[in-house]
């Protein structure tokens, strides 16, 4: 169980990092078997409560009561799974049951109690039951079984004494370790920490994930075009792969065949890689904003909450853009990094922030481009920065008034993505551009000159053709 902290202890934050495992085939088989044993514990609890329900008894859902039943089973009941890992499954079941009961009492009829079997269940070990030394992890096993030592793909980014728990998870056919640690708040020197009187407005967007209007006429714009290109190229690449394997893909009657399993595994790997790339790009963009705010000594970030944008029904294409945008993930990344830096984050309604002039407070037609121009007072500037200024003005907690930025810093999010740099080339873009050229769309490939008919004096067909333009 997690330890209890004294009331007067310094404040800490809980952060997690996912580390891949470099296990041998024998170690991988033991790790997968541990996850299967966790699923067996989950199934036993379901069967136990089903039996009690048939007898008319109350369900057994308390964590301590479930642990007593586990102790009666004895060691070695679930293979190599030790009691600490099995108790983590019981904790997961108990939390899920009480969460569903709470939602039911609140009037949510769609909340369901745990009822389905799960083949693989994540296992968690708390501090004191495992050991991490460099890139080596030692996991406990059942009595009279050799412990499991696994090599990590990289060193854990936290000191060993700060690690509170490790969780063994499986995603897209790969094994990972989620490490949770206690991280202290960032320490700043005298006169260098965040100033609560300095405030900045943050506007969330699709083209530009973050547009920040700070004090002193400073502004920051983080571009997300590389992330949008990653989503578009991933979609085009997935469609191209499906077309390529359509002829050799297994039919519906061959479900479970070797070819079917390989096809599904390849799809899961591609989807998981796409999600990892976008997740890292979101964290990099949020880190850019927080680093900029720390340099400017901003103590409060007023973030526009686009909840109104998600409620409307604007059609299938707009809903798809919003799903790809994922504003909740952007807000979570920004909040976590700002909290670790000691910066307060406040969410306000952003409705109408990009169509209101921050100078004369008049509503204007929302510009279709990136340029905002007020027909009443003549104010002009970046549309997203105008929204950030209006968002900062909606906070009622005090602070300096944020004006229209005069010095704008531009940063690009997702610089690690394939094809984001000038000297790098995404192989998917080459395949996608050639497909577009075959359809006849831009950029078009120049056709070879036609031979003039015999006896004709025209020399148009002999003119040299320029090289076709290349997509950036």
Where are these regions (language model features)?
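Gly/serine-rich nucleotide phosphate-binding loop at the start of the catalytic core
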Residues: 1-86, 466, 471
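Positively charged, helix-rich recognition surfaces that bind polyanionic ligands
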Residues: 6, 15-18, 29, 171-472
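Well-ordered beta-strand positions in beta-sheet-rich domains
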Residues: 18-20, 149, 165, 199
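Long, hydrophobic, amphipathic alpha-helical segments used as structural scaffolds
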Residues: 46-53, 97, 101-108, 183
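Acidic carboxylate diad motif detector
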Residues: 62-171, 324
């Amino acid at each position: 169980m997690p330890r209890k902290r004294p009331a007067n202890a310094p404040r800490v934050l809980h952060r997690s990092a996912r580390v891949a495992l470099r296990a041998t085939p024998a170690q991988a088989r033991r790790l997968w078997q541990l996850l299967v044993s966790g699923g067996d514990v989950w199934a036993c609890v379901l069967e136990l409560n089903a039996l009690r329900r048939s007898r008319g008894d109350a369900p057994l859902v308390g964590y301590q009561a479930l642990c007593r039943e586990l102790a009666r089973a004895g060691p070695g009941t679930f293979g190599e799974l030790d009691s600490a890992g099995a108790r983590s499954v019981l904790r997961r079941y108990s939390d899920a049951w009480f969460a569903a009961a709470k939602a039911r009492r609140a009037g949510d009829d769609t909340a369901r109690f745990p009822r389905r079997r799960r083949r693989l269940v994540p296992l968690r070990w708390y501090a004191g039951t495992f050991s991490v030394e460099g890139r080596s992890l030692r996991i406990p096993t059942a009595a009279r079984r050799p412990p499991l030592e696994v090599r990590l793909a990289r060193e854990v980014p936290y000191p060993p004494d700060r690690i509170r728990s490790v969780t063994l998870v499986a995603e897209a056919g790969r094994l990972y370790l989620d490490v949770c640690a206690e991280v202290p708040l960032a320490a700043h020197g005298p006169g260098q920490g965040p100033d609560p009187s300095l405030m900045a407005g943050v506007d969330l967007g699709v083209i530009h994930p973050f547009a920040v209007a700070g004090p002193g006429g400073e502004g920051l714009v983080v571009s997300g075009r590389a992330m949008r290109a990653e989503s578009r190229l991933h979609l085009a690449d997935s469609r191209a792969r499906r077309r390529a394997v359509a002829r050799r893909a297994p039919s519906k009657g061959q479900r479970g065949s070797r070819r079917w399993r390989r096809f599904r595994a390849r799809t899961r790997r591609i989807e998981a890689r796409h999600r990892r790339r976008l997740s890292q790009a979101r964290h990099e963009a949020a880190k850019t904003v927080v680093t900029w705010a720390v340099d400017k000594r901003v103590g409060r970030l007023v973030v526009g909450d686009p909840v109104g944008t998600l409620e409307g029904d604007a059609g299938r294409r707009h809903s798809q853009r919003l799903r790809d945008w994922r504003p909740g993930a952007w807000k979570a990344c920004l909040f976590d990094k700002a909290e670790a830096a000691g910066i307060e984050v406040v969410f306000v309604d952003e409705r109408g922030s990009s169509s209101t002039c921050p100078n004369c407070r008049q509503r204007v037609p929302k510009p279709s481009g990136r340029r905002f121009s007020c027909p009443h007072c003549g104010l002009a500037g970046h549309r997203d920065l105008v929204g950030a200024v209006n968002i900062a003005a909606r906070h009622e907690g005090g602070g300096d008034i944020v004006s229209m930025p005069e010095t704008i810093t531009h940063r690009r999010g997702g610089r690690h993505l394939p094809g984001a740099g000038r000297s790098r080339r995404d192989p998917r873009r080459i395949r996608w551009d050639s497909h577009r050229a075959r359809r006849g769309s831009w950029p078009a490939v120049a056709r070879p000159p036609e031979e003039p008919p015999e006896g004709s004096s025209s020399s148009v067909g002999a003119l040299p053709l320029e090289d076709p333009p290349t997509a950036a």
